Amino acid sequence: MERKNSLPAANALLLAVVALVGLNLRPFITGVGPLAASVSAETGLGLQGMALLTLVPMLLMGVFAFAGPSLQARFGARRSVVAALAVLSLGSFLRLFVATGWQMLGTAALLGLGAAIVQAVFPGIVKLRFPRHVGLVTGLYSAMLMGGGALGALMAPLIAAPARNWHAGLAWMAIPALLAAVLAARCLPRDGTPQAGGRAAAVLLKRPRTWLLMACFGLVNGGYSTVVAWLAPFYREHGWTSASSGGLLAIMAVAQALAALLLPVLAGKREDRRPWLWLTLAMQAAGFAALAARPEAAPVLWAALLGAGLGGCFSLSMIVALDHLPDPAEAGALSALMQGGGFLIAAMPPWIAALLHDLTGSFLAGWLLQLACIATVTWLYWHVDPRSYESAIRPPTLRKELPIETAPSA
C-alpha cells in the first residue's frame, strides 16, 4: 500500500518509466524540421509533402487514441505500452534505409502508430498508480514528452552533420525507444482484470463536454504541430543554419518541458485550472504575434514564450480531463477520447500553413491562423468550470451507465 502524502521509494522505477516513455514520444517529429532541406532534397518531398511527416503521425495519434480504452481492456495497459514502444524503435531504425518520399511517409506512419497507442493508454496508468499525485506525475510525463522534443530538435542536426547523413540524425531515436520498452516490460504492473474503459468511452462520446475538450486540445496542439513543423524552416528562410534553427526549436521544447512540469505544481492547489490555462494561452498569443510581426527582434524569447505556453497548456489540459472522473479507467477513457479528437484536429494546421505558404510565399498567414485558434480556445475554456464536471459528464440520465467508482488510494 502506498502512503497517502508522498511518493514512496518503491515507485522510483515506475517514475523512471513515466519519464523515459514520455521522452520517446516527440523526437521523431521535432527532429525532421532542422533537417528538412536535406530530407526534401533526397526524398523529393515538397513543402506540402514535408508537412505530411507531421500530419500523418498526428492523424494516427487521433485515430488510435479512440481505440485506447478498447486496447487496454483487451490486451492490458502493460502489453499495449511495451508493444507500442517496440514499434517506435522499429520506425526510427528503418529511417536508416529510407530513399523515397513514400518510404519516409511509411516510417512516419509507423512512428505515429506507436506514439498513438502509448498516449492513449498511459494517462490511465498514471491515474491508477498515482491517484493522489495525478498533477505532479502528469506534469513529469508531459515535461519529459516536451523534453524529448527538445532532444530530437537538438540532436538530429548534431548527429547528422559529422556523419554527413540525415538518416543517422533521425535513426538514433531507436535506441532510447528500445530502452523504454525494456524498462516498461520490467517495471509496469502486470495487467489484471480488464477495466471499464471501453464501455465508458461509448458513454462519454454522448457528452458535449467530451467534444469541447477535444476541440480545445486539438486547437492548442495544432499550434504545437505547426511550430515543430515550420519554426526551423521559417528561420532557415531568414538565413539561419540547420544547427541554429534546430537549436531554437530545442529552446522552445525546453521551455515546454519546464512549463509542463512547473505549472501543474503551481496550479495544484486550485480546483479551477482555468486562470492558469488562460495564462498559457496568453503566452502562446504573444509568441505567435511576435513571429508574425518581429521575428528577428528576439527569436529566443519568442521561442521560449511559445514553448512555455504550449507545454503548460498541454499538461493542464491533460489534468483537466483526468479531473472530471474519479475512476482511473473512466478518466483514462476521457483522456484518450480528448486526445483522439484533438490530434485529428491538430494534424491539419501544419498542412494548412504549408498551403498558405505556397499561396503567399510566407509563413505569416500560418502564424495569424494560430492567433485565431487561441482566441477560440480562450472562449471555449470559459465553459470548463469545475463546478460543472459532474453534471457535464454524468447527467441524471447517464449515471446508471457510468457509475461512480472509487480509485485506489496512494
Predicted regions and their residues:
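Helix-loop-helix hairpin linking two adjacent transmembrane segments in secondary transporters
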Residues: R132-L136, L140-P189
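A late C-terminal transmembrane helix in Major Facilitator Superfamily
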Residues: L325-L364, Q370
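Helix-to-loop junctions at the C-terminal end of transmembrane segments
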Residues: F64-G76, A259-D272
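Conserved MFS/SLC helix-loop-helix module at the cytosolic interface between two early adjacent transmembrane helices
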Residues: V63-W102
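Extracytoplasmic gate region of multi-pass secondary transporters
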Residues: V32-G33, P208-A250, A255-A260
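Cytoplasmic helix-loop-helix junction between adjacent transmembrane helices
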Residues: T107-A143
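Intracellular juxtamembrane helix-capping segments at the cytosolic ends
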Residues: I117-F130, G312-P326
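Helix-breaking motifs and short loop linkers at transmembrane-helix boundaries and internal kinks
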Residues: G44, G76, F97-W102, P131, ...
